[in-house]
A protein has these predicted regions:
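Terminal, low-structured helical/coil segments at or just beyond the last alpha-helical repeat
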Residues: 18-29, 118-151
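Alpha-helical segment of the N-proximal tetratricopeptide repeat
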Residues: 26-56
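Register position in tetratricopeptide repeats
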Residues: 40-41, 74-76, 110, 142-149
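Structural signature of tandem alpha-helical TPR/SEL1-like repeats
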Residues: 41-49, 76-89, 112-123
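Canonical tetratricopeptide repeat
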Residues: 67, 103, 139-142
């Protein structure tokens, strides 16, 4: 009798479980796409949420650390300490990460440390093999603008 009762309870719970809707958890790629869309719209809150979820799920994802740092730097009240933390993590995970070199260089300019930005510009020249890659060009322009504004 106990076996029959246990079987009926188990069967009932399986039927009940079948009625519960399945939640689709976004994949890392979906979260990164959502974060990039949010960044394009300057929706820093959503971008930070999505990239933080990716970092939590994949702590060794250099792209996620780079984008999370970017959101900390670009939000209304920049948090450069958090930005530097995640840029450095991205570069530790992937020392050749061109985007992280560009963005940490720009963060150093915000922090009034142009010599540090120049070091990352030099790193980009080596990584790119020339001065033509987009990341090098963007950081070079930011550095030139900084020097013009701060003679």
């Amino acid at each position: 009798m106990k076996k029959i009762l246990a079987t009926m309870m188990l069967a009932g719970s399986i039927v009940h479980a079948a009625d519960v809707p399945v939640m689709n958890v976004p994949t890392v790629n979906q979260r990164m796409k959502s974060a990039r869309t949010a960044i394009a719209q300057s929706d820093w809150r959503t971008a930070k949420f999505e990239t933080q979820k990716v970092v939590d799920e994949e702590p060794s994802n250099a792209d996620a650390h780079n984008l999370l740092a970017y959101t900390y730097r670009k939000q209304e009240k920049p948090d450069l300490a958090k930005a530097f933390e995640h840029y450095k993590t991205a570069l530790k995970l992937n020392p050749q990460h061109k985007g992280a070199h560009e963005y940490i260089g720009e963060a150093y300019l915000m922090d009034r440390k142009p010599a540090m930005a120049e070091q990352h510009l030099s790193d980009l020249e080596k990584i790119c093999g020339n001065r033509q890659c987009e990341e090098y060009q963007d950081l070079a322009k930011a550095l030139a603008a900084y020097r013009k504004a701060n003679p």
